[in-house]
Amino acid sequence: MTYADIILPVPLDGLFTYSVPAPMVGQVRFGVRVLVPFGPKITHVGVVARVHGKAPEGIAVRDLLRVLDTEPVVTATQYRLWQWMADYYMAPIGDVLKAALPAGLKAEEGYKPRTELYVRLRPEFGSARGLHVALDMIGR
């Protein structure tokens, strides 16, 4: 069985161990983002810190839900910096993760660009009177 230690954006010390389902074994590696269950109804996006084969003793381990990246979003150098920051400032590494990752990488779906919606009037609303009728229909 394969296990992964995950950095989660929660104010608790340490890493959280999850089991890696067989279909995901080739995808889970250091630095990729994963979606994991945390508590009864919450999911979090975390970063894989280590992949290993040692099961934690006396703890029920849950499965990873999904691998979000094909390439790592964190390098080994960045991770060492995060560890140093957590030690120096006596902060959980999850808080360092929250501060270090850009907002687009914290979401499950990744970066979502802002979009604008354009509306075009049908030809029958092309006149000034038709425009007023259309505006009245949508309630201004």
Predicted feature descriptions by range:
Residues M1-R140:
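Accessory, non-ATPase domains that flank or precede helicase/AAA+ motor cores in DNA-metabolism machines
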